[in-house]
Amino acid sequence: MSKSRLTVFSFVRRFLLRLMVVLAVFWGGGIALFSVAPVPFSAVMVERQVSAWLHGNFRYVAHSDWVSMDQISPWMGLAVIAAEDQKFPEHWGFDVASIEKALAHNERNENRIRGASTISQQTAKNLFLWDGRSWVRKGLEAGLTLGIETVWSKKRILTVYLNIAEFGDGVFGVEAAAQRYFHKPASKLTRSEAALLAAVLPNPLRFKVSAPSGYVRSRQAWILRQMYQLGGEPFMQQHQLD
């Protein structure tokens, strides 16, 4: 290898190492800060806002209103757990059984990819990472998930998730969603309304709360049944999530 190539390789290696250190400090600081402080915006919100501006849409505003867990209807937390991650109170960020099922399904159905991300993984991804599929992003997501599971309580993870989840075009967080679609605060959401909001996750740009398709209504009904089977509101109290 020539001297010039060695110099370039050495420069790139030093740059990547420094970048990794900067990102580790940034993400570590974010995990520590947001264990107690409200989250003002997420990486997904920034990505959506920048994309809108680049496409000339200057009216788009990625909007979120932070609310604490006691300002959110317990039905909402139960609905997303029933819909997205029923083992949320038990696992340490990853649902191994669901991952194995998803891998088996994806091998048989290459055109219909199924995910197995837990609420913890989705929180890490939405808060700190870019959208898309890649092994690099999944690796970073795994590390960040372990970080928030180590530092945050389950209640804190659920609180952040509900405040940064995307529920429609420019609608982030359950408070903004409740106001937009039901004209009420998140604390007043009914069981059925909570299930409808959860039914569009994790693809709220395809499935609409404001114009629910037959699939969304079917999923809403399924979520309501799962909420009942989990035990209703006592489930949230039992696991100290309310």
Curated annotation (Swiss-Prot):
Similarity comment text for this entry: Belongs to the glycosyltransferase 51 family.
Known catalytic reactions: [GlcNAc-(1->4)-Mur2Ac(oyl-L-Ala-gamma-D-Glu-L-Lys-D-Ala-D-Ala)](n)-di-trans,octa-cis-undecaprenyl diphosphate + beta-D-GlcNAc-(1->4)-Mur2Ac(oyl-L-Ala-gamma-D-Glu-L-Lys-D-Ala-D-Ala)-di-trans,octa-cis-undecaprenyl diphosphate = [GlcNAc-(1->4)-Mur2Ac(oyl-L-Ala-gamma-D-Glu-L-Lys-D-Ala-D-Ala)](n+1)-di-trans,octa-cis-undecaprenyl diphosphate + di-trans,octa-cis-undecaprenyl diphosphate + H(+)
Source species of the chain: Shigella dysenteriae serotype 1 (strain Sd197)
SUPFAM superfamilies: Lysozyme-like
Entry-linked Gene3D superfamilies: Biosynthetic peptidoglycan transglycosylase-like
Membrane topology: Single-pass membrane protein
TM regions (residue ranges): 19-39
EC number(s) from the headed UniProt entry: 2.4.99.28
Keyword set includes Ion transport: no
Domain of life: Bacteria
Protein name per the record: Biosynthetic peptidoglycan transglycosylase
CC per GO annotation: peptidoglycan-based cell wall; plasma membrane
BP term (GO), one: regulation of cell shape
Main location (coarse class): membrane
Any one Pfam family match given in the protein's UniProt record, by short name: Transgly
Group of enzyme by EC: transferase
Keyword set, alphabetical order: Cell inner membrane, Cell membrane, Cell shape, Cell wall biogenesis/degradation, Glycosyltransferase, Membrane, Peptidoglycan synthesis, Transferase, Transmembrane, Transmembrane helix
Pathway of action: Cell wall biogenesis; peptidoglycan biosynthesis
UniProt-annotated location(s): Cell inner membrane
GO MF annotations in UniProt: pentosyltransferase activity; peptidoglycan glycosyltransferase activity
Role according to the record: Peptidoglycan polymerase that catalyzes glycan chain elongation from lipid-linked precursors.
